[in-house]
Amino acid sequence: VNEPADXXARFTYDXYGLXVVGLIVAAVL
């Protein structure tokens, strides 16, 4: 879905995704 408001949603999704990646890395280590 390409909408003007998607910019903020995408930013939040990226931040959330980064945190998830961090948790996975921490779990592996």
UniProtKB/Swiss-Prot annotation:
Family under the similarity heading: Belongs to the FXYD family.
Alphabetized GO MF terms: chloride channel activity
Primary residence: membrane
Species whose genome carries this gene: Scyliorhinus canicula
PTM entry text: Phosphorylated by protein kinase C.
GO cellular-component term (any): chloride channel complex
Membrane topology: Single-pass type I membrane protein
Function: Induces a hyperpolarization-activated chloride current when expressed in Xenopus oocytes.
Compartments it resides in: Membrane
Keyword Hydrolase on entry: no
Protein name: Phospholemman-like protein
Alphabetic keyword roster: Chloride, Chloride channel, Ion channel, Ion transport, Membrane, Phosphoprotein, Transmembrane, Transport
Nucleus as UniProt keyword: no
